[in-house]
């Protein structure tokens, strides 16, 4: 099975993605992750103004199969949360790189997680 892996973002081995460039970045979970999770039924996220730390858990996604921690690909301040997910968590499954995004973060300089993968490296990992 082939999964979508956009090349305009970086990935953690734990299957979170982060957009690159700009004053703020967007974070979500990969197509592979949403497929492995199955139907997402609940998402727990931090609030705007909270700080997240690269490589550490910042939230939880719950599916019919499992409860999984979400890990931060960057350190910074949460500036927006996708509140649509509280009513429609299935957006994580339906559009993991679009409407199913999780957070927008203002990253701190040098705050990337260790071992962020580019699209080719991540694609090799999930192959």
UniProtKB/Swiss-Prot annotation:
Q: Note how many cofactor molecules are bound and how.
A: Binds 1 lipoyl cofactor covalently.
Database matches in CDD domains? GCS_H (cd06848)
Q: List the Gene3D superfamilies hit by this protein, alphabetically.
A: 2.40.50.100
Q: Which UniProt keywords apply?
A: Lipoyl
Pfam families from the entry? GCV_H
Give the matching InterPro entries.
2-oxoA_DH_lipoyl-BS, Biotin_lipoyl, GCV_H, GCV_H/Fam206, GCV_H_sub, Single_hybrid_motif
Give the N6-lipoyllysine positions (modified residues): 65
Any one GO BP annotation for this protein: glycine decarboxylation via glycine cleavage system
Coiled coil segments of this chain: none
**Which coenzyme or cofactor does it need?**
(R)-lipoate
Which stretches make up the Lipoyl-binding domain? 24-106
Which GO cellular component does the record give, naming just one? glycine cleavage complex
Could you name the domain of life of the organism this protein comes from?
Answer: Archaea
Which PANTHER family did the record assign? Answer: GLYCINE CLEAVAGE SYSTEM H PROTEIN (PTHR11715), GLYCINE CLEAVAGE SYSTEM H PROTEIN-RELATED (PTHR11715:SF3)
Q: Which NCBIfam families match?
A: gcvH, PRK01202.1
Q: How does it assemble?
A: The glycine cleavage system is composed of four proteins: P, T, L and H.
The text of the family note is: Belongs to the GcvH family.
What role does it play?
Answer: The glycine cleavage system catalyzes the degradation of glycine. The H protein shuttles the methylamine group of glycine from the P protein to the T protein.
Q: What is this protein's record name? A: Probable glycine cleavage system H protein
What organism is the protein native to?
Halorubrum lacusprofundi (strain ATCC 49239 / DSM 5036 / JCM 8891 / ACAM 34)
Q: Which gene encodes it?
A: gcvH
